[in-house]
C-alpha cells in the first residue's frame, strides 16, 4: 500500500525472496506426527509450507505476477542478497519493479540444540547489549522469526509517478 503502485506489468515485475531455513519447523512437526501417529500423523500442509519458494510464490499469486521468481538461501544474508539481486535486475533493465525481502520460521528444538552445541548463541548477559548484528564486538547470533518485503523500482520511474521514495540502493556486494 505504501508504495502507491496501482498497476504492475505482470511480466516486468520480479519477486525475489530469501530464506535461511524455509519450512524447517513444518518438516519437524510432520516428522514428529509421522513418528508418533504413523502415516496419518504426517501433515498434508507440509507440501505447501516447507518448500523454500512458497513466500515468493504466494506474493506472485496474490498480485498475478509472471516475471522472474527467485528464492535465495544464503543463511543470514538471504534478505540482503534478495534485495541486491532485485536491484541488479532493475538496473540491468530486466524488470521495472521487484518485490524483494525474506521470511523465516524455524525455531525448532533441534535447531536450537544444534546451534547451542556449536556455540552460536550470544554470550552477552546484558540484554541491552545482546543484539548487535553489525557490531564488531558481537558475540553470536540471536535467532528469531519474521518477514519483510520492499518494493523496488528505478528512481526516475518512482519520481515520475509521484511516489514517496524511502531510500536508494547505491551498491550491492556478496561474497563467500
Where are these regions (language model features)?
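Beta-strand segments within the central parallel beta-sheet cores of soluble alpha/beta enzyme folds
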Residues: 10-17, 70-74, 95-103, 164-172
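Conserved catalytic cysteine-centered active-site region
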Residues: 12, 22-85, 94, 117-142
Amino acid at each position: 500500500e505504501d508504495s502507491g503502485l496501482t498497476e504492475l506489468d505482470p511480466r516486468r515485475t520480479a519477486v525475489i525472496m530469501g530464506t535461511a531455513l524455509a519450512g524447517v519447523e513444518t518438516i519437524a512437526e510432520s516428522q514428529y506426527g509421522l513418528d508418533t501417529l504413523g502415516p496419518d500423523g504426517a501433515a498434508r500442509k507440509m507440501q505447501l509450507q516447507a518448500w523454500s519458494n512458497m513466500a515468493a510464490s504466494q506474493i506472485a499469486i496474490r498480485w498475478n505476477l509472471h516475471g522472474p521468481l527467485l528464492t535465495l538461501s544464503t543463511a543470514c544474508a538471504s534478505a540482503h542478497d534478495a534485495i541486491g539481486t532485485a536491484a541488479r535486475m532493475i538496473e540491468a533493465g530486466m524488470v521495472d519493479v521487484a518485490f524483494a525481502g525474506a521470511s523465516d520460521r524455524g525455531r525448532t528444538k533441534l535447531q536450537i540444540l544444534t546451534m547451542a552445541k556449536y556455540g552460536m548463541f550470544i554470550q552477552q548477559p546484558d540484554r541491552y547489549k545482546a543484539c548487535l548484528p553489525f557490531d564488531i564486538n558481537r558475540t553470536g547470533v540471536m535467532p528469531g522469526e519474521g518477514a519483510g518485503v520492499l518494493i523496488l523500482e528505478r528512481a526516475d520511474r518512482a519520481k515520475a509517478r509521484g511516489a514517496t521514495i524511502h531510500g536508494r540502493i547505491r551498491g550491492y556486494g556478496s561474497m563467500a
